[in-house]
Amino acid sequence: RAALGITQLKRINKINELRKNASLYYHKNLQNIPGIILPDMVNDKSHSYHLYTIRVTKPFKLSRNQLFKKLKNNGIRTTVYWMPIHKYSAFRKFAKVSNVVNTSKIYNEILALPLFPTISKKHQDSVIKVIKSS
């Protein structure tokens, strides 16, 4: 595994560039869909583009879970990451419901679209098509 990691590190700039380009493609093609909130793409900042996570909000015709199922039924894997810490049994006693309203709201809206260095435009187009047709 260490050998794989070292090999990946040698190509990290190329990998990040591929992920960035795929993120920009999603961003360009998913703009202006009511109820779909895209991640901020700040020109003077850089990151690894590890995920492309959208928010599915009320103006959109489907809930996040409904969109998740529709994408899955079309052979597209999406993921919901980062369960709020107050949902874990070990931390539940520390959270007051009134203090975690936004956390719960965001958690119920987020959906990570497929994103990996070798993702094709064809694959992305199928994701975009399902979202736009919803």
Language-model features and meaning:
Residues R1-S134:
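PLP-dependent aminotransferase class I/II
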